[in-house]
């Protein structure tokens, strides 16, 4: 038996190659093989294996029992036969298969019916073939049309082969080549039991598991549709028959019928169940209603009948922020925007035309920056981000503060009269905007801003500083220059209505016209070293609006430093709401709104640097100052300088409408003292500082508003502009560091830093002046100013910050002298305007010093103002020189403005004290 078993394991059969079998035997190393090799030499082993006649090898090995259908597993042969018959379009039945096997494999014993059925069932379970009423079909001929070589190397098939060949030999033992039938019978009796048992277990399990699979497979088979349960049942029946036969009756087939019946029932049941399940699944797939009932659109015929809640839910999903209230608010805001845009277009059409290209450039550049900032206070609207022309309306939406946002646009209507841009306070617009939530009221306003800002903010906020940036050769420089120019142009537009002071602060209509005319007439001038100035003037028209914003910003400094004072500044400014006092009114509006509006406007005006000026109060401005101390000094200082001039001037302007934008005489007086003090620190004389500041302011006014001292404005603008240009531009690059250094240096060398800072502030404030000078004198000496600025920038950049500050201070002293002369020459440059300018200078200085000289340790308003002036000058020059210092770069500027202009004291002493407050505020913010 051992031998027989070993032979069976080897599965040698008569037709097989004996040499191959011997090699197999050597590889398998069965007991028989081991004995064979042991007894006979290796050379003799092949012979013994071939003949199987060796005494030790052949006689006991009954080779006949190993009646494999073929060397290839029967299942594979059946697959090949079925595939061939399918290709020949012959129906494949068990009888046909038997015939085919007999014909195609004449040397191979034909399997019995039972083995054939069993093998076919196994193949069906294995999904290699599928039964149909027309016969068996190969499932995937490409996959299962396996060549004998593949089958040989397929252990799986060898395993099947082990089972199937044994079955075949059991059921139909072939007369072995040299095998006695007895051995075959013995093996038949013995092996079939085990084999059949294994087959039975296998088959039942496989059948149960695969019956549904078989059905599916057959259904899936492309050749035939779903096999009816009966069809499918037939192969299972065969399978179960064979399975049961072998499993229950291995030795004899006496009980095959019973077992077959059982297996039939079982198989039929399984197939039916599986088929039903499949059908149920299919039905389930298509039985569902579409669209599902839970879908909101229940009535397709009447879609208008969508439930309100469903519709709202859909809308919410589409746009969570979209609500009826928001939509209404957005619609109202858009209407207001359109109106404001129309007003702005009317007022600043020429300004828009002249500054459109520059504005677009600056808009793009500063829009990105301001957007990043405005993202923090998008709702507040980043006036600095948008051009101020756009900002007035944009700010209204951005800030939604009737006073802050709207006053700028609504309160100040820029009219281009002749060459002058006159800022008219549009009380109605202002009032119409007043109902709007203050910009600092973010809760309701934020949504509005979200809806509004997308449209107005870019044009407003971003246009404002963008215009500045685009105008300056570099975005930042442009931003600084444009801020200064915007503030100046605002002051100019205000000065048209108010006075040289207001004009210089906001930009007189002349300056606006000059900005337009110069921008339009002399692009090269506008692109002079401080091309931003030109653009600022071009933007000056925009700044006319911006000027109103600047006036608001002017008030903003006061409000920022002393949030209490916005009302005073506003009250001072409010009396003069006529176009002349519009700057005052703008300042007035900006004062009340400056708490928040000034945050935004001043930040925007100063440099968009205080893009984050979210706080409606001076604290935020102080924070902004702190945030953008260097930059704020750089950026805000120019704007703030302008703004302080404007804010301080508006009072004087109100008192003497031709004067400063929003300073008012009281503001002028306060500023005069503040400037005197600040400039005493700078110039060591309140009068020199105030006068210098007034010069600066007035020269600005004269620049913007030659009415007062047009004579010396141009000549002085040229000289002081050159100085200012050189100063602002020279420190532009060094300004950031210098402004930062300025605080320590201010602390260490207040006088030194003060002259330099004052120079810078004058450059910054006078940069506005010098920007205005550039605007006014750029026509005469745009190239000269540009060259001077470039040379001075280079020199000052090379020279130390303190040296540059000293140089700038000297130049500012000269400028202040010029401005004094201009102030004296200017008819509007009365004491009130001088006070306004001094106050403006003091505010600017105090704003700058409050931010920059926070650590200076100087509490005197003069020192603060001088430091602020220095800071402003540095900031302005840095802005001109270094675009990186542009408002977008620093947010400290607005803080300076806020503090400086937050003091709306009516008298110089009060304003000087307020610069101290500004300094303190800046210290707190810093």
From Swiss-Prot:
Residues 1-32, 338-394, 452-529, 632-693, 724-803, 825-926 are annotated as: Disordered. Residues 518-529, 746-772, 847-884, 914-926 have a biased composition (Polar residues). GO terms for cellular component: cytoplasm; nucleus. Residues 353-378, 463-472 have a biased composition (Basic residues). It comes from the Eukaryota. Residues 18-32, 379-394, 473-495, 632-658, 684-693, 785-799 have a biased composition (Basic and acidic residues). GO terms for biological process: embryo development ending in birth or egg hatching; maternal placenta development; regulation of transcription by RNA polymerase II. One of its GO terms (molecular function) is RNA polymerase II transcription regulatory region sequence-specific DNA binding. Transmembrane segments: none annotated. This is Storkhead-box protein 2. It comes from Macaca fascicularis (Crab-eating macaque). The gene is STOX2.
């Amino acid at each position: 038996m051992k031998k027989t078993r070993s032979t069976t394991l080897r599965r040698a059969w008569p037709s097989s190659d004996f040499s191959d079998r011997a090699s197999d035997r050597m590889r398998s190393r069965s007991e028989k093989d081991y004995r064979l090799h042991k007894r006979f030499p290796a050379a003799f082993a092949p012979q013994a294996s071939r003949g199987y006649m060796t005494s030790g090898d052949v006689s006991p090995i009954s080779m006949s029992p190993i009646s494999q259908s073929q060397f290839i597993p029967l299942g594979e042969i059946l697959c090949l036969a079925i595939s061939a018959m399918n290709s020949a379009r012959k129906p494949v039945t068990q009888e046909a298969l038997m015939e085919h096997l007999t014909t195609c494999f004449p040397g191979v014993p034909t399997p019995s019916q039972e083995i054939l059925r069993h093998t076919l069932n196994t193949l069906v379970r294995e999904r290699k073939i599928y039964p149909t009423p027309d016969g068996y079909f190969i499932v995937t001929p490409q996959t299962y049309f396996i060549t004998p070589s593949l089958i040989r190397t397929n252990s799986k098939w060898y395993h099947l082969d082990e089972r199937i060949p044994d079955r075949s030999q059991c059921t139909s033992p072939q007369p072995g080549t040299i095998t006695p039938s007895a051995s075959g019978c013995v093996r038949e009796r013995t092996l079939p039991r085990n084999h059949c048992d294994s087959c039975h277990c296998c088959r039942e399990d496989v059948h149960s598991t695969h019956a549904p699979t078989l059905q599916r497979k057959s259904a899936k088979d492309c050749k035939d549709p779903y096999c009816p349960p009966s069809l499918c049942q037939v192969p299972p029946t065969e399978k179960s028959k064979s399975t049961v036969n072998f499993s229950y009756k291995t030795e004899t087939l006496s009980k095959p019928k019973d077992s077959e019946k059982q297996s039939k029932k079982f198989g039929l049941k399984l197939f039916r169940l599986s088929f039903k399940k499949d059908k149920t699944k299919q039905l389930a797939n298509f039985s569902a209603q579409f669209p599902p009932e839970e879908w909101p659109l229940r009535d397709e015929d009447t879609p208008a009948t969508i439930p309100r809640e469903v519709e709202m839910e859909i809308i919410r999903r589409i746009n969570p922020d979209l609500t009826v209230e928001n939509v209404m608010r957005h619609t109202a805001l858009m209407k207001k925007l359109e109106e404001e845009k129309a007003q702005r277009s009317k007022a600043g059409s020429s300004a828009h035309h002249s500054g459109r290209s520059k504005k677009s450039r600056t808009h793009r550049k500063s829009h990105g920056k301001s957007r990043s900032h405005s993202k923090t206070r998008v709702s507040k609207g980043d006036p600095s981000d948008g051009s101020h022309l756009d900002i007035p309306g944009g700010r209204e939406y951005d800030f939604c503060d009737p006073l802050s946002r709207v006053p700028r646009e609504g309160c100040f209507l820029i009219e281009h009269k002749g060459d002058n841009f006159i800022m008219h306070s549009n009380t109605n617009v202002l009032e119409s905007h007043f109902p709007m939530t203050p910009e600092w009221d973010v809760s309701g306003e934020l949504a509005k801003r979200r809806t509004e800002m997308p449209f107005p903010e870019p044009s407003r906020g971003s246009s404002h500083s963008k215009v500045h940036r685009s105008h300056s050769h570099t975005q930042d420089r442009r931003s600084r220059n444009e801020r200064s120019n915007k503030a100046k142009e605002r002051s100019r537009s205000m000065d048209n209505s108010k006075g040289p002071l207001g004009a210089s602060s906001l930009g007189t209509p002349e300056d606006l016209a000059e900005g337009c005319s110069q921008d339009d007439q002399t692009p090269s001038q506008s692109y002079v070293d401080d091309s931003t100035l030109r653009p600022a003037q071009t933007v000056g028209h925009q700044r006319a609006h911006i000027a109103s914003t600047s006036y608001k910003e002017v008030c903003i400094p006061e409000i920022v430093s002393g949030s209490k004072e916005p009302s005073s500044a506003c009250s001072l400014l409010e009396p003069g709401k006529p176009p002349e006092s519009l700057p005052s009114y703008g300042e007035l509006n900006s004062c009340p709104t400056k708490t928040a509006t000034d945050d935004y406007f001043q930040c925007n005006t100063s440099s968009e640097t205080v893009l984050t000026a979210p706080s409606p109060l001076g604290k935020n401005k102080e924070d902004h100052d702190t945030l953008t101390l260097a930059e704020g000094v750089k950026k805000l200082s120019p704007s703030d300088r302008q703004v302080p001039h404007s804010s301080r001037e508006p009072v004087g302007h109100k008192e003497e409408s031709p004067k400063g934008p929003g300073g008012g005489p009281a503001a002028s007086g306060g500023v005069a003292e503040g400037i005197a003090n600040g400039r005493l620190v700078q110039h060591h004389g309140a009068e020199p500082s105030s006068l210098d500041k007034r010069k600066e302011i007035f020269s600005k006014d004269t620049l913007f508003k030659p009415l007062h001292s047009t004579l010396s404005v141009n000549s002085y603008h040229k000289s002081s502009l050159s100085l200012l240009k050189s100063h602002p531009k020279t420190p532009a690059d060094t300004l950031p560091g210098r402004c930062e250094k300025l605080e320590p240096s201010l602390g260490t060398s207040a006088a030194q830093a003060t002259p330099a800072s004052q120079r810078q502030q004058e450059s910054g404030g006078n940069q506005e002046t010098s920007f205005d000078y550039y605007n006014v004198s750029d026509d005469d000496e745009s190239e000269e100013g540009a060259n001077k600025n470039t040379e001075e920038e280079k020199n000052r950049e090379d020279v130390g910050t303190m040296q540059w500050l000293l140089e700038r201070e000297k130049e500012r002293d000269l400028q202040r002298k010029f401005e004094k002369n201009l102030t004296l020459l200017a008819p509007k440059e009365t004491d009130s305007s001088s006070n306004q300018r001094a106050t403006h200078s003091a505010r600017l200085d105090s704003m700058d010093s409050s931010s920059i000289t926070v650590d200076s340790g100087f509490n005197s308003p003069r020192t603060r103002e001088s430091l602020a002036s220095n800071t402003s000058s540095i900031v302005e020059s840095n802005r001109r020189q270094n675009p990186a210092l542009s408002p977008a770069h620093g947010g400290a500027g607005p803080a300076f403005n806020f503090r400086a202009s937050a003091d709306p004291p009516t008298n110089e002493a009060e304003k000087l004290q307020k610069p101290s407050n500004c300094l303190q505020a800046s210290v707190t913010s810093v």
